[in-house]
Protein backbone atom coordinates (compact mmCIF):
# COMPACT_ATOMS: atom_id res chain seq x y z
CA UNK A 1 0.00 0.00 0.00
CA UNK A 2 1.26 3.48 -0.79
CA UNK A 3 -0.66 5.71 1.65
CA UNK A 4 0.05 6.12 5.35
CA UNK A 5 -3.02 7.42 7.20
CA UNK A 6 -2.27 9.28 10.45
CA UNK A 7 -4.86 10.42 13.01
CA UNK A 8 -4.05 13.66 14.86
CA UNK A 9 -5.76 16.46 16.77
CA UNK A 10 -7.75 18.91 14.67
CA UNK A 11 -5.59 21.98 14.02
CA UNK A 12 -2.33 20.05 14.29
CA UNK A 13 -2.25 18.66 10.76
CA UNK A 14 0.75 20.79 9.72
CA UNK A 15 2.75 19.57 12.70
CA UNK A 16 1.86 15.94 12.06
CA UNK A 17 2.68 16.43 8.36
CA UNK A 18 6.08 18.00 9.06
CA UNK A 19 6.93 15.17 11.41
CA UNK A 20 5.97 12.30 9.09
CA UNK A 21 7.73 13.97 6.15
CA UNK A 22 10.97 14.11 8.14
CA UNK A 23 10.69 10.66 9.69
CA UNK A 24 9.77 8.93 6.43
CA UNK A 25 12.68 10.64 4.68
CA UNK A 26 15.02 9.37 7.39
CA UNK A 27 13.85 5.84 6.51
CA UNK A 28 14.38 6.52 2.79
CA UNK A 29 10.66 6.25 2.07
CA UNK A 30 10.01 9.13 -0.31
CA UNK A 31 6.62 10.71 -0.70
CA UNK A 32 4.51 13.80 -0.13
CA UNK A 33 1.88 14.96 2.34
CA UNK A 34 -1.80 15.52 1.63
CA UNK A 35 -3.77 17.31 4.32
CA UNK A 36 -6.25 20.07 5.05
CA UNK A 37 -6.45 22.18 8.18
CA UNK A 38 -8.89 20.93 10.85
CA UNK A 39 -9.41 17.55 9.10
CA UNK A 40 -7.73 15.76 12.04
CA UNK A 41 -5.78 13.43 9.78
CA UNK A 42 -2.79 13.43 7.44
CA UNK A 43 -2.04 11.28 4.39
CA UNK A 44 1.57 10.55 3.53
CA UNK A 45 1.51 9.27 -0.06
CA UNK A 46 4.62 7.26 -0.84
CA UNK A 47 6.26 7.18 -4.26
CA UNK A 48 6.76 3.43 -3.85
CA UNK A 49 3.60 1.31 -4.02
CA UNK A 50 4.79 -0.57 -0.91
CA UNK A 51 6.07 2.48 0.94
CA UNK A 52 3.33 2.53 3.57
CA UNK A 53 3.91 -1.17 4.29
CA UNK A 54 7.53 -0.31 5.06
CA UNK A 55 6.55 2.58 7.35
CA UNK A 56 4.08 0.61 9.49
CA UNK A 57 6.83 -1.97 10.04
CA UNK A 58 9.85 0.27 10.61
CA UNK A 59 8.43 3.52 12.05
CA UNK A 60 7.39 3.14 15.68
CA UNK A 61 4.10 4.87 16.45
CA UNK A 62 5.43 5.53 19.95
CA UNK A 63 8.23 7.63 18.42
CA UNK A 64 5.80 10.02 16.71
CA UNK A 65 4.77 13.07 18.73
CA UNK A 66 1.66 14.26 16.90
CA UNK A 67 0.15 11.03 15.47
CA UNK A 68 -2.40 9.24 17.65
CA UNK A 69 -2.68 6.26 15.34
CA UNK A 70 -1.48 5.23 11.88
CA UNK A 71 -2.25 2.58 9.30
CA UNK A 72 -1.20 1.64 5.79
CA UNK A 73 -4.01 2.39 3.34
CA UNK A 74 -4.90 1.95 -0.29
CA UNK A 75 -6.35 4.64 -2.51
CA UNK A 76 -9.33 6.68 -1.31
CA UNK A 77 -12.56 4.79 -1.83
CA UNK A 78 -14.90 7.52 -3.04
CA UNK A 79 -18.54 7.45 -4.08
CA UNK A 80 -19.19 4.14 -2.34
CA UNK A 81 -22.66 3.03 -3.51
CA UNK A 82 -25.37 3.36 -0.87
CA UNK A 83 -26.81 -0.02 -1.80
CA UNK A 84 -23.47 -1.78 -1.24
CA UNK A 85 -20.78 -0.18 0.87
CA UNK A 86 -19.35 -3.54 1.93
CA UNK A 87 -18.43 -5.00 -1.47
CA UNK A 88 -15.94 -2.34 -2.63
CA UNK A 89 -14.29 -2.18 0.80
CA UNK A 90 -13.83 -5.95 0.97
CA UNK A 91 -12.46 -5.94 -2.59
CA UNK A 92 -9.93 -3.21 -1.73
CA UNK A 93 -8.60 -5.38 1.11
CA UNK A 94 -8.23 -8.55 -0.95
CA UNK A 95 -4.48 -8.67 -0.32
CA UNK A 96 -4.99 -8.99 3.45
CA UNK A 97 -5.32 -12.35 5.17
CA UNK A 98 -6.21 -13.52 8.67
CA UNK A 99 -6.34 -10.14 10.39
CA UNK A 100 -7.42 -10.14 14.02
CA UNK A 101 -9.69 -7.11 14.42
CA UNK A 102 -11.82 -4.62 12.48
CA UNK A 103 -12.15 -0.95 13.37
CA UNK A 104 -14.53 1.29 11.43
CA UNK A 105 -13.53 4.81 12.44
CA UNK A 106 -13.71 8.51 11.62
CA UNK A 107 -11.32 11.41 12.21
CA UNK A 108 -11.82 13.26 15.50
CA UNK A 109 -13.91 16.18 14.21
CA UNK A 110 -17.52 17.16 14.88
CA UNK A 111 -18.36 16.74 11.19
CA UNK A 112 -16.84 13.27 10.97
CA UNK A 113 -18.44 12.18 14.24
CA UNK A 114 -21.83 12.59 12.57
CA UNK A 115 -20.91 9.41 10.70
CA UNK A 116 -20.37 7.43 13.92
CA UNK A 117 -23.83 5.87 13.96
CA UNK A 118 -23.41 4.82 10.33
CA UNK A 119 -19.98 3.32 11.11
CA UNK A 120 -21.41 1.24 13.95
CA UNK A 121 -24.20 0.03 11.69
CA UNK A 122 -21.77 -0.88 8.90
CA UNK A 123 -19.37 -2.76 11.17
CA UNK A 124 -21.42 -5.96 11.49
CA UNK A 125 -22.02 -6.65 7.76
CA UNK A 126 -18.49 -5.51 6.91
CA UNK A 127 -17.03 -7.86 9.51
CA UNK A 128 -19.04 -10.71 8.03
CA UNK A 129 -17.86 -9.86 4.52
CA UNK A 130 -14.22 -9.70 5.58
CA UNK A 131 -14.47 -13.04 7.38
CA UNK A 132 -15.99 -14.61 4.30
CA UNK A 133 -13.17 -13.27 2.12
CA UNK A 134 -10.52 -14.56 4.53
CA UNK A 135 -9.19 -11.09 5.34
CA UNK A 136 -10.47 -11.38 8.92
CA UNK A 137 -10.28 -14.31 11.33
CA UNK A 138 -13.51 -15.75 12.73
CA UNK A 139 -12.31 -15.00 16.27
CA UNK A 140 -10.58 -11.77 17.27
CA UNK A 141 -6.83 -11.95 17.93
CA UNK A 142 -4.63 -9.23 19.42
CA UNK A 143 -1.57 -10.79 17.78
CA UNK A 144 -2.70 -10.29 14.20
CA UNK A 145 -2.90 -7.12 12.06
CA UNK A 146 -5.83 -4.75 12.59
CA UNK A 147 -8.06 -3.75 9.67
CA UNK A 148 -8.93 -0.04 9.65
CA UNK A 149 -11.69 1.56 7.61
CA UNK A 150 -11.79 5.30 8.21
CA UNK A 151 -14.69 7.31 6.76
CA UNK A 152 -13.62 10.89 6.09
CA UNK A 153 -17.02 11.82 4.68
CA UNK A 154 -20.27 10.26 3.41
CA UNK A 155 -19.33 7.48 0.98
CA UNK A 156 -15.60 8.23 1.29
CA UNK A 157 -13.17 6.01 3.17
CA UNK A 158 -9.57 4.86 3.43
CA UNK A 159 -9.11 1.16 4.14
CA UNK A 160 -5.97 -0.63 5.24
CA UNK A 161 -4.20 -2.19 8.19
CA UNK A 162 -1.91 -1.60 11.15
CA UNK A 163 0.34 -4.07 12.95
CA UNK A 164 -0.92 -4.95 16.43
CA UNK A 165 2.51 -4.42 18.05
CA UNK A 166 2.86 -0.98 16.42
CA UNK A 167 -0.62 0.40 16.87
CA UNK A 168 -2.68 2.21 19.48
CA UNK A 169 -4.95 -0.19 21.37
CA UNK A 170 -7.62 2.51 21.37
CA UNK A 171 -10.34 3.20 18.82
CA UNK A 172 -9.18 6.23 16.74
CA UNK A 173 -6.13 6.31 19.01
CA UNK A 174 -8.19 7.94 21.78
CA UNK A 175 -8.23 6.43 25.30
CA UNK A 176 -11.60 6.57 27.03
CA UNK A 177 -10.89 7.87 30.53
CA UNK A 178 -13.43 8.86 33.15
CA UNK A 179 -13.06 12.02 35.17
CA UNK A 180 -13.09 11.02 38.85
CA UNK A 181 -15.72 12.90 40.85
CA UNK A 182 -13.22 13.80 43.57
CA UNK A 183 -10.38 14.90 41.26
CA UNK A 184 -9.46 18.57 41.90
CA UNK A 185 -9.28 19.48 38.19
CA UNK A 186 -9.64 18.06 34.68
CA UNK A 187 -5.87 18.28 34.27
CA UNK A 188 -5.84 15.07 36.29
CA UNK A 189 -6.78 13.19 33.12
CA UNK A 190 -3.55 14.30 31.41
CA UNK A 191 -1.34 12.45 33.88
CA UNK A 192 -3.69 9.47 33.94
CA UNK A 193 -3.43 9.23 30.15
CA UNK A 194 0.33 9.76 30.26
CA UNK A 195 0.90 6.79 32.56
CA UNK A 196 -1.10 4.61 30.18
CA UNK A 197 0.66 5.98 27.10
CA UNK A 198 4.23 5.58 28.32
CA UNK A 199 4.02 2.51 30.57
CA UNK A 200 2.38 -0.87 30.03
CA UNK A 201 -0.01 -2.18 32.67
CA UNK A 202 2.73 -4.48 33.93
CA UNK A 203 5.22 -1.61 34.12
CA UNK A 204 2.73 0.54 36.02
CA UNK A 205 2.37 -2.19 38.65
CA UNK A 206 6.08 -2.01 39.49
CA UNK A 207 6.95 1.61 38.66
CA UNK A 208 3.77 3.37 39.85
CA UNK A 209 3.35 1.34 43.00
CA UNK A 210 2.33 2.27 46.51
CA UNK A 211 5.09 3.59 48.75
CA UNK A 212 7.13 5.43 46.13
CA UNK A 213 8.03 9.08 46.72
CA UNK A 214 7.01 11.72 44.19
CA UNK A 215 7.32 15.47 43.65
CA UNK A 216 4.72 17.57 41.83
CA UNK A 217 6.07 20.96 40.72
CA UNK A 218 3.32 23.53 40.16
CA UNK A 219 0.86 21.24 41.90
CA UNK A 220 -2.05 23.60 42.74
CA UNK A 221 -4.90 22.65 43.04
CA UNK A 222 -3.73 19.04 42.83
CA UNK A 223 -4.92 17.46 39.58
CA UNK A 224 -1.64 15.63 38.98
CA UNK A 225 -1.01 15.02 42.68
CA UNK A 226 -4.38 13.25 42.75
CA UNK A 227 -3.15 10.62 40.28
CA UNK A 228 -0.01 10.00 42.34
CA UNK A 229 -2.01 9.69 45.56
CA UNK A 230 -4.50 7.37 43.85
CA UNK A 231 -1.59 5.04 43.09
CA UNK A 232 -0.47 5.03 46.72
CA UNK A 233 2.53 7.36 46.46
CA UNK A 234 3.77 9.89 49.00
CA UNK A 235 3.81 13.31 47.34
CA UNK A 236 5.66 16.57 47.90
CA UNK A 237 3.29 19.11 46.29
CA UNK A 238 5.15 22.31 45.42
CA UNK A 239 3.12 25.46 44.71
CA UNK A 240 2.49 28.87 46.27
CA UNK A 241 -1.23 28.36 45.67
CA UNK A 242 -3.69 26.33 47.79
CA UNK A 243 -4.09 22.56 47.48
CA UNK A 244 -7.36 20.65 47.45
CA UNK A 245 -8.38 19.99 51.11
CA UNK A 246 -9.48 16.41 50.42
CA UNK A 247 -6.05 15.56 49.02
CA UNK A 248 -4.38 16.96 52.11
CA UNK A 249 -6.64 14.82 54.32
CA UNK A 250 -5.21 11.62 52.79
CA UNK A 251 -2.00 12.06 54.76
CA UNK A 252 -0.01 11.26 51.60
CA UNK A 253 0.67 14.87 50.60
CA UNK A 254 3.04 17.44 52.08
CA UNK A 255 2.47 20.93 50.69
CA UNK A 256 5.53 23.10 50.14
CA UNK A 257 4.60 26.74 49.49
CA UNK A 258 7.51 27.48 47.19
CA UNK A 259 8.51 28.35 43.64
CA UNK A 260 8.83 25.16 41.62
CA UNK A 261 11.90 26.53 39.86
CA UNK A 262 13.74 27.04 43.16
CA UNK A 263 12.57 24.02 45.12
CA UNK A 264 15.09 21.37 46.12
CA UNK A 265 13.73 18.06 47.43
CA UNK A 266 14.64 17.55 51.11
CA UNK A 267 14.81 13.81 50.52
CA UNK A 268 16.87 12.31 47.71
CA UNK A 269 14.84 9.12 47.22
CA UNK A 270 12.28 10.65 44.86
CA UNK A 271 11.13 8.22 42.18
CA UNK A 272 8.58 10.28 40.21
CA UNK A 273 8.86 13.94 39.26
CA UNK A 274 5.82 15.46 37.55
CA UNK A 275 5.40 19.01 36.32
CA UNK A 276 2.56 20.85 34.57
CA UNK A 277 3.46 24.53 34.81
CA UNK A 278 2.33 27.30 32.48
CA UNK A 279 5.81 28.42 31.51
CA UNK A 280 8.01 28.75 28.45
CA UNK A 281 8.87 25.22 27.30
CA UNK A 282 12.61 25.89 27.19
CA UNK A 283 12.57 26.99 30.84
CA UNK A 284 10.70 23.86 31.94
CA UNK A 285 13.13 21.72 29.93
CA UNK A 286 16.09 23.38 31.67
CA UNK A 287 14.50 22.63 35.04
CA UNK A 288 14.08 18.95 34.14
CA UNK A 289 17.70 18.82 32.95
CA UNK A 290 18.90 20.27 36.26
CA UNK A 291 16.91 17.74 38.29
CA UNK A 292 18.26 14.91 36.12
CA UNK A 293 21.88 16.08 36.45
CA UNK A 294 21.46 16.35 40.23
CA UNK A 295 20.04 12.82 40.36
CA UNK A 296 16.85 13.96 42.08
CA UNK A 297 14.43 11.57 40.36
CA UNK A 298 14.18 8.28 38.49
CA UNK A 299 11.28 9.00 36.13
CA UNK A 300 9.61 12.25 35.13
CA UNK A 301 6.48 13.24 33.25
CA UNK A 302 6.23 16.91 32.31
CA UNK A 303 4.33 19.13 29.92
CA UNK A 304 5.80 21.59 27.43
CA UNK A 305 3.46 24.40 26.37
CA UNK A 306 3.56 24.91 22.60
CA UNK A 307 3.97 28.13 20.60
CA UNK A 308 1.34 29.12 18.04
CA UNK A 309 3.63 28.43 15.06
CA UNK A 310 6.41 25.96 14.18
CA UNK A 311 5.30 23.65 16.96
CA UNK A 312 7.00 20.53 15.61
CA UNK A 313 10.26 22.43 15.10
CA UNK A 314 10.12 23.86 18.63
CA UNK A 315 9.46 20.47 20.21
CA UNK A 316 12.22 18.82 18.15
CA UNK A 317 14.80 21.42 19.18
CA UNK A 318 13.90 21.14 22.87
CA UNK A 319 13.99 17.33 22.88
CA UNK A 320 17.32 17.31 21.03
CA UNK A 321 18.73 19.79 23.55
CA UNK A 322 17.58 17.72 26.52
CA UNK A 323 19.12 14.63 24.96
CA UNK A 324 22.41 16.37 24.20
CA UNK A 325 22.77 17.82 27.71
CA UNK A 326 22.00 14.53 29.45
CA UNK A 327 24.43 12.71 27.16
CA UNK A 328 27.14 15.29 27.89
CA UNK A 329 26.64 14.57 31.58
CA UNK A 330 26.94 10.83 30.92
CA UNK A 331 23.35 10.17 31.95
CA UNK A 332 21.72 7.06 30.49
CA UNK A 333 18.09 7.75 29.67
CA UNK A 334 15.02 6.94 27.61
CA UNK A 335 12.71 9.74 26.44
CA UNK A 336 9.33 9.77 24.71
CA UNK A 337 7.05 12.65 23.78
CA UNK A 338 3.37 12.60 22.82
CA UNK A 339 0.61 15.06 22.02
CA UNK A 340 -1.96 13.27 24.15
CA UNK A 341 -5.72 13.39 23.67
CA UNK A 342 -6.16 15.35 26.91
CA UNK A 343 -3.38 17.76 26.00
CA UNK A 344 -4.36 20.96 24.25
CA UNK A 345 -1.60 23.33 23.15
CA UNK A 346 1.09 21.28 24.85
CA UNK A 347 2.93 17.98 24.60
CA UNK A 348 3.78 15.51 27.35
CA UNK A 349 7.28 14.13 27.83
CA UNK A 350 8.32 10.98 29.70
CA UNK A 351 11.95 10.90 30.81
CA UNK A 352 13.33 7.74 32.41
CA UNK A 353 16.75 7.95 34.04
CA UNK A 354 18.36 4.55 34.47
CA UNK A 355 19.63 4.41 38.09
CA UNK A 356 22.95 3.34 39.49
CA UNK A 357 22.99 -0.15 40.96
CA UNK A 358 22.05 -0.26 44.58
CA UNK A 359 20.10 3.01 44.66
CA UNK A 360 16.81 2.61 46.53
CA UNK A 361 13.69 4.67 45.83
CA UNK A 362 11.36 2.95 48.27
Swiss-Prot record:
Keyword list, A-Z: Cytoplasm, Methyltransferase, rRNA processing, S-adenosyl-L-methionine, Transferase
Catalytic site: 305
InterPro entries: RlmM_FDX, RlmM_THUMP-like, RNA_MeTrfase_FtsJ_dom, rRNA_MeTrfase_M, SAM-dependent_MTases_sf
Gene Ontology process terms (BP): methylation; rRNA processing
Protein residues bound to S-adenosyl-L-methionine: 187, 220-223, 239, 259, 276
A Pfam family it matches: FtsJ
Enzyme Commission (EC) number: 2.1.1.186
Function text: Catalyzes the 2'-O-methylation at nucleotide C2498 in 23S rRNA.
Subunit: Monomer.
Name used for this protein in its record: Ribosomal RNA large subunit methyltransferase M
Amino acid sequence: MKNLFLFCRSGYEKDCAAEIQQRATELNVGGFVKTNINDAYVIYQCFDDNGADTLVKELALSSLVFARQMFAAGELLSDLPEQDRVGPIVASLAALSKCGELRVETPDTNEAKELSAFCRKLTVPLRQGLKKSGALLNAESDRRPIIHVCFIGPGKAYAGYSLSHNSSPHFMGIPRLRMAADAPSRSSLKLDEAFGAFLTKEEQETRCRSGLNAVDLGACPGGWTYQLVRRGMMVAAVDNGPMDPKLMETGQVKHYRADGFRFEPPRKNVYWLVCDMVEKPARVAELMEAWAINGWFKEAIFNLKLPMKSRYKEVSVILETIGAILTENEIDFKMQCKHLYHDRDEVTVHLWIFPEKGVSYA
